[in-house]
Amino acid sequence: MAKAKSVDATWSDMKAEIAKIDTRQLVSLLADLYRFSKENQAFLHARFAVVADPLDPYKRTIAECMYPDVYKNKPVQISKAKKAISDYSKAEGDSLGEAELMTFFVERGNAFTVNFGDIDEEFYDALNRMYRRAIEKILSLPEKQRDEFKERLKTIMTSSADIGWGFHDALCEDYYSAFPEDE
């Protein structure tokens, strides 16, 4: 009698099945996955570095989510913007690219609140957490790659001076803890 298939397949099950197919079938499978979603396309573009700027689709998503078109009634979508960063990390795992996307996330969110006013505590908490994550990622980079990011982080901090919810204070605390020489 044939062994019954498990209801919950695992990666090991999938890997065993994939190992049985030839190159042509594997390419066909990847083509199907590529056509299935924009996220898959961005993942494969980043993984195989086939586009000039693998960050571009992720930055577009972050920009649309963190600085939405308010005149078209588009909402801020923090979780979708964070997912774009996570998706890039899974596709590429490049610390420099991750630092860029994290910093860009905070830049777009900060620009949105500077231009459109007070948002809510959840929004500012998300920006503060991402600012901290960006600093941690930037500090893990080689020293010569940090300077541009440091300037961008400082610009975010200084431009937030008139924003409430403790946002500016938290940015200052995080920035000067990471870069005490600037205090």
Q: Where do the protein language model's features map onto the residues?
A:
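N-terminal interaction modules that seed assembly of large macromolecular complexes
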Residues: 4-70
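N-terminal intrinsically disordered, cationic/polar leader segments
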Residues: 98, 102, 119-122, 133, ...
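Alpha-helical membrane-embedding segments
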Residues: 115-121, 163
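Eukaryote-biased recognition of C-terminal alpha-helical segments
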Residues: 128-183
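Long, charge-patterned amphipathic interaction tracts in eukaryotic proteins
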Residues: 40-117
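Structural recognition of alpha-solenoid helical scaffolds
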Residues: 25-26, 80, 102-105, 130, ...
